[in-house]
């Protein structure tokens, strides 16, 4: 019974543990085992690993060996593939996979066989990242099955294009192992061609061909079924079946045509201007068209950019010009908008199409300067029929598919708010051409109608009743009612379809000035309140017009709402404008000469000449569209006239656009004799040759009518070019008779431009621009129909129609670009940032790079300042940016301190030459915003670079949203605080911004609403500042990939697995303890019988089969009586039972375990 005693004396806690462990679910046991296996495996896979090739001809070939746990071993070749070879070649820096021999060509390896059934995708960074059976596991491989590879670093490989007429087109041939071979055309596409053209430095791929288009080759066929993504550095880096593996013959040899080897050109035909018309492409010596299938604004933008025209505004599907003929070279063109040439966009193969010439594509290119959008016939600029003028062609918009989204875009573009409705039937019929504009749709959030996609200009008809008409929310049609003379009366404004009056407290002198101008009533004379012109009826508009006075229409003025019911018709406002709106010349031989007559108070009368001078006459001639004043003859030359002689005296300066703009006095003027009436002779339609009044070689040209005040020559002979970015390019302007004016582009050509460039000392003309290429001018259009022979020394020595004689508008202002015109830019294909990139200068009509020899920080500062970027920058190393290759213009630029522009810095002579990217200058200018005098780079006083100097920001309205924009712009973390009152000291210089009101999501501070630049009443004691979170990004250096893995990841994995296993064992321990506690509670709450049963079962569970056999074989049935209570102490230690209970348990046990 000693064995039984051992059972009774055993700690029942360990018995609990064994019982619960045995009763664990299969899932729990599986998890424990898997984690244990992972723990063991990770200790193996996490060690450092290395890769090498052994016994090969060179470092890029041989038997594959892997080092694991400091022991080198081989790889079995079961399932060995080219994908695995590619991974190994890339890993070892031999990127070109040649072949995957089934067994090593060299002698067999020795030691462990570490890997078997290796399965790679080809893009893994290391061989052990591929799937395999497990370290050291293999299918009874021997070292006769050791895997090997043959790679190459590409140095012994060559490629060429043959039979194409040049080195950039032809049949593809590759030299491998000393033999030239071809490429099969199976699955060959534009991606393959792109790799080849880039590899051969032949530009971009234009086309590819198969079926031995360039003749059949000879020798091996090296590649078949290539798979390229288009960005590989060499063709042999694309996926392939292996060198020399194919199922082709030379009838399937592939070829390519690259851009540098193609005879490619693009032109526009049959357009209104040189930048509009049908598109035609020259390919392989023949011109053909482009089908309009899928043609949209992205395609048009690429075409316009390629042609050197402004941004594409219209993408014409069917043009007004005649149909093309010949080839249709391209179809289904699909551009993203950034491609440098139309043939670099996706398209069908050259010559493959499903079109006819009724579907020829075209474009109209424009930067918007020659486009005009307006609403006509609706009573104000914000309502009416939609009219579009594109490059002198006037058209209407067809309302097929026209809705509120399209109308919203028009209203927004015109500054007229949002669309109220899209039809207003009482508009007057404004005549337009039969040219119609069609839009497929707008999404409603475009900034202009030109931004809507899929324009179609012309080619289709639209009925007159289909013309698009809209009314915008800012539509306010003004009128003057109840006045006793023209241009006076009660102010009434029409909103929508309703007329209403304005309260006299809501209409300022500035608003009245705008009203008079819009009604063509000259200037405001007075504002009269208190219903001076009678009380109106109906609506009184509860809004205040907040005009500045320079607006052309009342609808352009901001409006502030006013509470309803605070005004009555007894306070209707009235306005009196200048009365001198009707004026004429009478008794002259032409409409542009004669006696001056005004209509005042409904009656015509002559004007007294007591204060009439040439400046007044200039304004009158311009108002009558008669050019400029040539003379102001006296002595009633054109008759005395009948009726009233008005004694009003005009005080014009000569620069006004309208006689009503000139100050007028009449009070106290003396009576005027009938022979003292004002007269004028305007230049009108007279044709003459004009010269400088100050020229010593040419005296003033005598007029045909010798009057004492005649002017027939330019007063000072001044000439300038405006808005061109330099003194040698821009809009041509001439100073004549006290005002600057422009030249019309009719007949404007290089001969005229040559004279301008020579006169200004700007070399020769390289471009004579028209259509207000440099923006619309103001003032007179002095000259038209210029006919220079190119030898004149002054532009006004050329023949023309004469001063002011023209039929033009400022949309036709002429301009020039001279050879000495220079411009500057930083450009980068990878970024649109204008303040970083390759330094380029424009000279003699072309862009070129700048060499970095002698380039200094001082020179970089000059460049950055000239570009308005910052006051300094840094020189970057040669960029990998794939910027277009262009020649170098200049080198050795050495700027001393002081120059404002790069043009003032000495350098080597201009010399156009080819240069390598390493010789070019790459610059990054500093940020236009900075923080000063703070403890870190992300806190301090806010300063902005603008207008060539650093300045501060006033703290009026400055808050955390403004600070957030600054922090984001500087690359710092979120804003912590927005400081006021010069927290980081007072700055110097201008205070550039005030009343900044950011939302917090703007990309830069100058995108936030604020007062105009430099308009501030603040002092530097109000300088704004910020405190941003200071983000310090520390880059962890990466270990070079040489076949060795990092130990760090292995340690981490082992640690995690250990923690998981520990957690599982702790959970089992607490589970056991908790169950024992429940059992104690159960025993104490039950009766004695239950206690006896539980104890019996617990004892029984601790006895194995041998114990039971021993007890059953006992011959002395009374041995059990020898057990004493003392021998059961170990039981009572775990179950609190009495002595009687112990005896009962013993007796019960004897009865159950044998018939003693």
Swiss-Prot record:
Induction trigger: Induced by anti-inflammatory mediators such as glucocorticoids, interleukin-6/IL6 and interleukin-10/IL10; suppressed by pro-inflammatory mediators like bacterial lipopolysaccharides (LPS), IFNG/IFN-gamma and TNF.
Primary localisation category: membrane
Positions on the Extracellular side per record topology: 42-1050
Cytoplasmic side of membrane: 1072-1156
Subcellular locations according to the entry: Cell membrane
Keywords for the protein's UniProt record, in alphabetical order: Acute phase, Cell membrane, Disulfide bond, Glycoprotein, Inflammatory response, Membrane, Phosphoprotein, Repeat, Secreted, Signal, Transmembrane, Transmembrane helix
GO terms for biological process, alphabetical: acute-phase response
SUPFAM superfamilies: SRCR-like
Disulfide bonds: 76-141, 89-151, 120-130, 184-248, 197-258, 228-238, 291-355, 304-365, 335-345, 398-462, 411-472, 442-452, 503-567, 516-577, 547-557, 608-672, 621-682, 652-662, 744-808, 757-818, 788-798, 864-925, 895-905, 954-1018, 967-1028, 998-1008
Post-translational modification: A soluble form (sCD163) is produced by proteolytic shedding which can be induced by lipopolysaccharide, phorbol ester and Fc region of immunoglobulin gamma. This cleavage is dependent on protein kinase C and tyrosine kinases and can be blocked by protease inhibitors. The shedding is inhibited by the tissue inhibitor of metalloproteinase TIMP3, and thus probably induced by membrane-bound metalloproteinases ADAMs. Phosphorylated.
Cleavable signal peptide: 1-41
Protein task: Acute phase-regulated receptor involved in clearance and endocytosis of hemoglobin/haptoglobin complexes by macrophages and may thereby protect tissues from free hemoglobin-mediated oxidative damage. May play a role in the uptake and recycling of iron, via endocytosis of hemoglobin/haptoglobin and subsequent breakdown of heme. Binds hemoglobin/haptoglobin complexes in a calcium-dependent and pH-dependent manner. Exhibits a higher affinity for complexes of hemoglobin and multimeric haptoglobin of HP*1F phenotype than for complexes of hemoglobin and dimeric haptoglobin of HP*1S phenotype.
UniProt name for this protein: Scavenger receptor cysteine-rich type 1 protein M130
């Amino acid at each position: 019974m000693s064995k039984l005693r051992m059972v009774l004396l055993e700690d029942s806690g360990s018995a609990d543990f064994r019982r619960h462990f045995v009763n664990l679910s299969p899932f729990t046991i599986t998890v424990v085992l898997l984690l244990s296996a992972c723990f063991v495996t990770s200790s193996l896979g996490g060690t450092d690993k290395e890769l090498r090739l052994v016994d090969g001809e060179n470092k890029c070939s041989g038997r594959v060996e892997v080092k694991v746990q400091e022991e080198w071993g081989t790889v079995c070749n079961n399932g060995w593939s080219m994908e695995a070879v590619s991974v190994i070649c890339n890993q070892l820096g031999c990127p070109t996979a040649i072949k995957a021999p089934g067994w090593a060509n060299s002698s067999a390896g020795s030691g462990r066989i570490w890997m078997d059934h290796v399965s790679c995708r080809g893009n893994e960074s290391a061989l052990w990242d591929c799937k395999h059976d497990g370290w050291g596991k293999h299918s009874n491989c021997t070292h006769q099955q050791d895997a090997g590879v043959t790679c190459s670093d590409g140095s012994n490989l060559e490629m060429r294009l043959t039979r194409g007429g040049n080195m950039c087109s032809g049949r593809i041939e590759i030299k491998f192992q000393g033999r030239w071979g071809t490429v099969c055309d199976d699955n060959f596409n534009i991606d393959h061609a792109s790799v080849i053209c880039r590899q051969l430095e032949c530009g971009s791929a234009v086309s590819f061909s198969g079926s031995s288009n360039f003749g059949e080759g000879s020798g091996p066929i090296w590649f078949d079924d290539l798979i390229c993504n288009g960005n590989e550095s060499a063709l042999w880096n694309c996926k392939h079946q292996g060198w020399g593996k194919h199922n082709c013959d030379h009838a399937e040899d592939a070829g390519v045509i690259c851009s540098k080897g193609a005879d490619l050109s693009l032109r526009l035909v049959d357009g209104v201007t040189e930048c509009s018309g049908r598109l035609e492409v020259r390919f392989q010596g023949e011109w053909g068209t482009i089908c309009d299938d899928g043609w949209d604004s992205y395609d048009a933008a690429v075409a316009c950019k390629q042609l050197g025209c402004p941004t594409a505004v219209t993408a014409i599907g069917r043009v007004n010009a005649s149909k093309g003929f010949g080839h249709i070279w391209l179809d289904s063109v699909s551009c993203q908008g950034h491609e440098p040439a139309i043939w670099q966009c996706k398209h069908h193969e050259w010559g493959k199409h499903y079109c006819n010439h009724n579907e020829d594509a075209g474009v109209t290119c424009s930067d918007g300067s020659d486009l005009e959008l307006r609403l006509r016939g609706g009573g104000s600029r914000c309502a009416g029929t939609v009219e579009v003028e594109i490059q002198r062609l006037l058209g209407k918009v067809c309302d097929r598919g026209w809705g509120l989204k399209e109308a919203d875009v028009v209203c927004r573009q015109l500054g007229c708010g949002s669309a109220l409705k899209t039809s207003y039937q009482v508009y007057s019929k404004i005549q337009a051409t039969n040219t119609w504009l069609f839009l497929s749709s707008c999404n409603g959030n475009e900034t202009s109608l030109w931004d809507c996609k899929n324009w179609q200009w012309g080619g289709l008809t639209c009925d007159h009743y289909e013309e698009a008409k809209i009314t915008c929310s800012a539509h306010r049609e003004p009128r003057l009612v109840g006045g006793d003379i023209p241009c006076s009366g009660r102010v009434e404004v029409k909103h929508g379809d309703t007329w209403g009056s304005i309260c006299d407290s809501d209409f300022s002198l500035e608003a009245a000035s705008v009203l008079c101008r819009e009604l063509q009533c000259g200037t405001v004379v007075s504002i009269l309140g208190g219903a001076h012109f009678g009380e109106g009826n109906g609506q009184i508009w509860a809004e205040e017009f907040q005009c500045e006075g320079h607006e052309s229409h009342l609808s352009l003025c901001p409006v502030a709402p006013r509470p309803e019911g605070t005004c009555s018709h007894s306070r209707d406002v009235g306005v009196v404008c200048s009365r001198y709106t009707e004026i004429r010349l009478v008794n002259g031989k032409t409409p542009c000469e004669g006696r001056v007559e005004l209509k005042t108070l409904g009656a015509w009368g002559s004007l007294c000449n007591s204060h009439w001078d040439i400046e007044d006459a200039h304004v009158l001639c311009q108002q009558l569209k008669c050019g400029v004043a040539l003379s102001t003859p006296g002595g009633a030359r054109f008759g005395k006239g009948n009726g009233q002689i008005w004694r009003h005296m005009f005080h014009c300066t000569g620069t006004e656009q309208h006689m009503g703009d000139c100050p007028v006095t009449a009070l106290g003027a003396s009576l005027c004799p009938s022979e003292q009436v004002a007269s004028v002779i305007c230049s009108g339609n007279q044709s003459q040759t004009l010269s400088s009044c100050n020229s010593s070689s040419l005296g003033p040209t005598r007029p045909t009518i010798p009057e004492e005040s005649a002017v027939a020559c330019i007063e000072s002979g001044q000439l300038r070019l405006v808005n061109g970015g330099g003194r040698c390019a821009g809009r041509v302007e001439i100073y004549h008779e006290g005002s600057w004016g422009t030249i019309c582009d009719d007949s404007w050509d290089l001969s005229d431009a040559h004279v301008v460039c020579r006169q200004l000392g700007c070399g020769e003309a390289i471009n004579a621009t028209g259509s207000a290429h440099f923006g619309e001018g103001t003032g007179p259009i002095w000259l038209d129909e210029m006919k220079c022979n190119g030898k004149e020394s002054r532009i006004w020595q050329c023949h023309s129609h004469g001063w002011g004689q023209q039929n033009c508008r400022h949309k036709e202002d002429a301009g020039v670009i001279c050879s000495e015109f220079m411009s500057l830019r930083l450009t980068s294909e990878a970024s649109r940032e204008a303040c970083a990139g390759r330094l380029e200068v424009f000279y003699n009509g072309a862009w070129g790079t700048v060499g970095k020899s002698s380039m200094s920080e001082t020179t970089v500062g000059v460049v950055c300042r000239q570009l308005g970027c910052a006051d300094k920058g840094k020189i970057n190393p040669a960029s990998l940016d794939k910027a277009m290759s262009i020649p170098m213009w200049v080198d050795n630029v050495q700027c001393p301190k002081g120059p404002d522009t790069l043009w003032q810095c000495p350098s080597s002579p201009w010399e156009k030459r080819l240069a390598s990217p390493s010789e070019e200058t790459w610059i990054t200018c500093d940020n236009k915003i900075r923080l000063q005098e703070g403890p870190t780079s992300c806190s301090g006083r806010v300063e902005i670079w603008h207008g060539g100097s650093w300045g501060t920001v006033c703290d009026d309205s400055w808050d955390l949203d403004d600070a957030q924009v600054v922090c984001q712009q500087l690359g710092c973390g979120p804003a912590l605080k927005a400081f006021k009152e010069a927290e980081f000291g007072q700055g110097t210089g201008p205070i550039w911004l005030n009343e900044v009101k950011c939302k917090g999501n703007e990309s830069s501070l100058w995108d936030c609403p604020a007062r105009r630049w430099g308009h501030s009443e603040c002092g530097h004691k109000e300088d704004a500042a910020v405190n941003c979170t200071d983000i310090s990004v520390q880059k962890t250096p990466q270990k070079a990939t040489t076949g060795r893995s990092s130990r760090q990841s292995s340690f981490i994995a082992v640690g995690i697995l250990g923690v998981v296993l520990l957690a599982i064992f702790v959970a089992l321990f607490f589970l056991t303890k908790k169950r024992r506690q429940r059992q104690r509670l159960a025993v104490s709450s039950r009766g004695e019988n239950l206690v006896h049963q539980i104890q019996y079962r617990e004892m029984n569970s601790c006895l194995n089969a041998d114990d039971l056999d021993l007890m059953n074989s006992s011959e002395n049935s009374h041995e059990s009586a020898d057990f004493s209570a003392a021998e059961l102490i170990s039981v009572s230690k775990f179950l609190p039972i009495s002595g009687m209970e112990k005896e009962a348990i013993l007796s019960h046990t004897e009865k159950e375990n044998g018939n003693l």
